[in-house]
């Protein structure tokens, strides 16, 4: 497992899983999760590790778990 703050831009594919709720969170954090395609706790999406995705992950590291896709 990679900690969200250690994610680097690369050609790799990432599995991003929401692990915490957005209740009580800021609107920009909810918007970031929605932009990544995450809708609920335990939901996982697969994205390329480009600059946009890594930037979004870095704004919400406490809400997601990031792993390299197999």
From Swiss-Prot:
What's one GO-annotated cellular component?
A: cytosolic large ribosomal subunit
- Which InterPro entries does this UniProt record tie to the protein? Ribo_uL30_ferredoxin-like_sf, Ribosomal_uL30_bac-type, Ribosomal_uL30_CS, Ribosomal_uL30_ferredoxin-like
Annotated keywords: Ribonucleoprotein, Ribosomal protein
Pfam families with a match to the protein in the record: Ribosomal_L30
- Origin: domain of life: Bacteria
Citing just one GO molecular function, the answer is: structural constituent of ribosome
Its GO biological process terms?
A: translation
Tell me which SUPFAM superfamilies the record gives: Ribosomal protein L30p/L7e
List the HAMAP family hit by this protein, alphabetically: Ribosomal_uL30_B (MF_01371_B)
* Name by which UniProt lists this protein: Large ribosomal subunit protein uL30
């Amino acid at each position: 497992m990679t900690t969200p703050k250690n994610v680097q831009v690369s050609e790799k594919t990432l599995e991003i899983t929401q692990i915490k709720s957005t209740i009580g969170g800021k609107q920009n954090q909810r918007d970031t999760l929605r932009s990544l395609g995450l809708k609920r706790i335990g939901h996982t999406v697969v994205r390329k590790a480009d600059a946009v995705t890594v930037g979004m992950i870095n704004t919400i590291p406490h809400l997601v778990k990031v792993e390299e896709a197999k």
